[in-house]
Amino acid sequence: MTKKKSPVISFEDFSFQYRAQKKPTLTGINLNIYPGEKVLIAGPSGSGKSTLAGCINGLNPFSNPGESTGKLIVDGVDAMQSSIFELSAHVGTVLQDPDGQFIGLTVGEDIAFALENSCTPQDKMHEITKHAAELVGIEHHLDYAPHELSGGQKQRVSLAGVMVDEVKILLFDEPLANLDPAAGKQAIELIDEIQKKTDTTVLIIEHRLEDVLWRNVDRIVLVNDGTILADLTPDKLLSTNLLRDNGIREPLYITAMRYAGIDITKEKKPAHADSVVLDESDQKKLRNWFSAQPFSPKEPEGAVSYTHLRAHETELHL
């Protein structure tokens, strides 16, 4: 019988209230994250997802004062009783604004910052820095200044900077916030590649769900009003109405399927457009729906774009 792994992150009846607020931002959180998992934590603005992340990496309560109840264990340590410095040895965080993490004058200096603080010998420091840069594909930019880099390249530098500590947990706080869709896909590909190479536990805090699902995740944890509403596989979550009901835009191909009258179930494997299982009846419904839509070059602002929906027709193998 295979022994079940112990969670690397464990919330037990955990609540957190910022000192400046009258009521808790997080209430009754129970959640286990296991070693090697890649988990998306999704929720609308103000849902509590960033507060959840801040409790994991130590920003709460050490940079943002507040009180907690319950228990939060991160890689074997009590997060609420540990210093932010101690937690940084377990959790590496890449912020949505990588400019806020730059410290060195060059890419190489920035990646090596934590090594300098720990008095790593020069030869070892160069070796580790080079390896981290190669791992994220930024090795040819070590002499560049931060302002010479694109948004995606800055994110790679931030990632390399936290990986030199060989942390077990990587936390990405809205990594797509400042990236266009193409750069966003590259970022998700990089995160997926790093996770596979290192077997690191990865948490992605993000509301751009379709972009994150460009690569597989093990689970999606849906947060709203400071509580966990769902902890499901992508296939199971996308077969519900929970995303729409909580202000998260579901993937556009899912919207197209719903408009066409298709019953979306987990058995149809809806997590990725190119792997959706559609029988002949479903395919006919989609073709008929696409054919019946008049093309309108002027679509209402904020509406689901028919043009974008149409772009998924090929992905759905129609």
Please provide the spans of the model-predicted regions:
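Catalytic Walker B motif of ABC-type/P-loop ATPase nucleotide-binding domains
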Residues: 170-173
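Conserved ABC transporter NBD signature motif
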Residues: 65-77
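ABC ATPase C-loop
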Residues: 162-163
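ABC ATPase NBD coupling module
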Residues: 78-92, 117, 237-238
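Conserved small/polar residues in nucleotide/adenosyl-binding loops
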Residues: 307-314
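Conserved ABC ATPase "signature" region
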Residues: 123-141
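Conserved beta-strand-loop-alpha-helix hinge in the C-terminal portion
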Residues: 227-253
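Conserved ABC ATPase signature
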Residues: 145-149, 153
